Amino acid sequence: MITNAISKIIKYDFKNTQLLNEALTHPSVLSKDNNNFNYERLEFLGDAVLNLVVSEMLFNIFPYDTEGNLAKKKTALVCGTKLVEIAQSINLGIFIIMSDGERSCGGANNSNNLENALEALIGAIYLDGGLKAAKDFIFLFWKNSATHMKVPPQDAKTILQEWAQSKGFPAPSYHIINKSGPDHNPCFTVEVRINSHETLHATGHNKKLAEQKAASLMLAKINYKIK
């Protein structure tokens, strides 16, 4: 069974397997009973839990780091590139439930799908087992990278721009293609384009965050690994 297979990989057994199913369900799957039965809500929660746990982890690992250095390290550990890297390491794509159309278009290997499903999985673990369970999962897959961070890494946009310059390409361009939600909680969709590479989209609660996430996805697309 899928539940048993993924539980062995993530070292966590769900008490409520419905939460796991929801975390692994892509929005392309339409439910007759609940149109919201997909990973989007859990992704929202998981993103917040991941940021909290990684922040505390870095705070304890690096007691003498400045706020600025801690922030840079956290950015590298929660960026799209790192999420995709971890999702691929546990073969998360093969467990994502999606429509035949989405799968035939490479949905199981799509960076955005992997990133979203991993955050949703964290959210599901948090709801099922509490903060302790979520921390155990995050420590299992993130602590090694956090511990071996020697120099504060650059943000994804800076890394992408330097990569483009090293290839003789023009600087990446970012454009807001959609803004939705209420004024107090907006959601921006940003498109990034670089040379001949396809455009990629990412969303965030502000323009800066959406651009960083788009840059992270592009780095994952070109197989650039943040050390």
Curated annotation (Swiss-Prot):
Catalytic activity reported: Endonucleolytic cleavage to 5'-phosphomonoester
Catalytic site: 47, 119
EC number(s) recorded for this UniProt protein: 3.1.26.3
Domain DRBM: 155-224
Any one GO molecular function term: ribonuclease III activity
Coiled coil: none
Pfam families in alphabetical order: dsrm (PF00035), Ribonucleas_3_3 (PF14622)
Gene Ontology cellular-component terms listed: cytoplasm
SUPFAM superfamilies in the record: dsRNA-binding domain-like, RNase III domain-like
Family: Belongs to the ribonuclease III family.
Function of the protein: Digests double-stranded RNA. Involved in the processing of primary rRNA transcript to yield the immediate precursors to the large and small rRNAs (23S and 16S). Processes some mRNAs, and tRNAs when they are encoded in the rRNA operon. Processes pre-crRNA and tracrRNA of type II CRISPR loci if present in the organism.
Known partners and oligomeric status: Homodimer.
Name of this chain's protein: Ribonuclease 3
